[in-house]
Regions:
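A nucleotide- and high-energy phosphate-metabolite-utilizing enzyme signature
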Residues: 1-238
């Protein structure tokens, strides 16, 4: 349901913006495409009815001077940013029937201070040069859920390349454990006589972190680990 909603919202926002500004193009007049990446429960095929959407917007336009081809042209960068803003507005506007979804965009490069819609070359450079280990963990459960197949293919190639990097196992273990302990300190609601099934020791998030560690540790040698974003099939593969 969520993926159908995302695709429809994207189509509506796209139609609205292209009617005003035209289509984003490069010097050859070609549209380089736009895609929505789903992270977390959405990317991992575990979305519940009460879940929010962890999203990242990427596009294929890398020329900062490229413009749309309509009567009121704007730069491609502005167009894609407005597209993302319009989509978030449509997801989160409250109506008498409620809202579609809460949206979390903090997993994009540089978090809340980063561009709302990121050129895919910038996304790739960030993942190679600046991303923290926890951001690579997040890639384990990331996949394109709507958008241009060309951008989807480029994203998947980047994802696989990052996850298949050979890493220092000792540093990886320290990084993963440090992040897990930070999360536990803030989120674990276990108490005497009560166990937090999600955040408690041995709970759901511990299992997720173990799976993510395993992918980052061994995907360099066992590429079949790159084929899934959900914990069930990753556990079966392991």
């Amino acid at each position: 349901i969520a993926e159908s909603v995302i695709a429809r919202v994207m189509d509506l926002a796209w139609a609205d913006l292209t009617a005003r500004h035209g289509r984003p193009t490069d010097i050859l007049g070609e549209d380089k495409g736009f895609a929505v990446i789903g992270y977390g429960k959405l990317g991992g095929l575990e979305l519940g009815y009460g879940s929010d959407l962890d999203l990242v917007f990427i596009h294929g336009s890398s020329n900062p001077n490229a413009m749309t081809d309509g009567e009121k042209p704007v730069s491609n960068e502005v167009f894609y940013a407005r597209l993302g803003q319009r989509m978030i507005h449509m997801f989160t506007t409250r109506t008498p029937s409620g809202l579609l979804y809460e949206v979390d965009m903090r997993l994009r490069p540089n978090g809340n201070s980063g561009m709302l819609a990121t050129p895919i070359e910038t996304f790739e450079r960030y993942q190679h040069r600046d991303a923290w280990t926890w951001e690579h963990q997040a890639l384990v459960r990331a996949r394109v859920v709507a958008g241009d197949p060309r951008v989807d293919a480029r994203f998947e190639a980047i994802r696989r390349g990052i996850l298949a990097q050979r890493r220092d196992p000792d540093k990886l273990q320290v990084d993963v454990l440090e992040m897990r302990e930070k999360m536990r300190a803030n989120l674990d609601k276990s108490e005497p006589g009560g166990f937090d099934l999600k955040q408690g020791r041995g709970g759901i998030v511990d299992i997720e972190f173990m799976v993510q560690y395993a992918v980052l540790r061994w995907a360099c040698d066992y590429r079949e680990l790159l084929g899934w974003t959900d914990n069930i099939r990753l556990l079966e593969t392991l």
